[in-house]
Amino acid sequence: MRSNKLKPLVIGDITIEHPLALAPMAGVTDLPYRLLCKEQGAGMMCTEMVSAKGLYYGNRKSEPLMATDSKEIPVAIQIFGSDPEIMGQMAAKVNDGRFQMIDINMGCPVPKVVRNGEGSALMKNPKLVYELVSATVKAIKKPVTVKIRKGFDDDCLLYTSDAADEARS
């Protein structure tokens, strides 16, 4: 007889018993929504995307995006940016116990994000992908994941994922 039970997902030292993850969605995945999804069986939560530059410059809009509750563990914070130094510093800043992992956004197609060389624009620059992931991994001792899209051409996805994997080594 075949079992319908999903196997746990392991990311670094985190085991997600029910391997259904709530994707980060700007304007949607605030704390109340994440708690509702947790009640309904989501095994891992992720915040809305938070700007590394916003954190760096103390933008007051950033803090509410990072609200957490112990009921939603494990929870990841999703950060985005294009400056490796700032990304590393802000990864260290949010390494305060609220989050079990960091997800780097390299998939957002919103024009104002892409114009700043952030989000999905990063997929056109594997060297910068490597630098951003490397700076984040070096700054913390938690798992780092990367959200990417299909890409701009046939090779884009491979170059991006290869650069991210190499940076984590």
Model regions and ranges:
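Flavin-dependent oxidoreductase catalytic cores
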Residues: 1-161
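Single conserved hydrophobic/aromatic residue that forms the stacking wall/gate
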Residues: 159-169
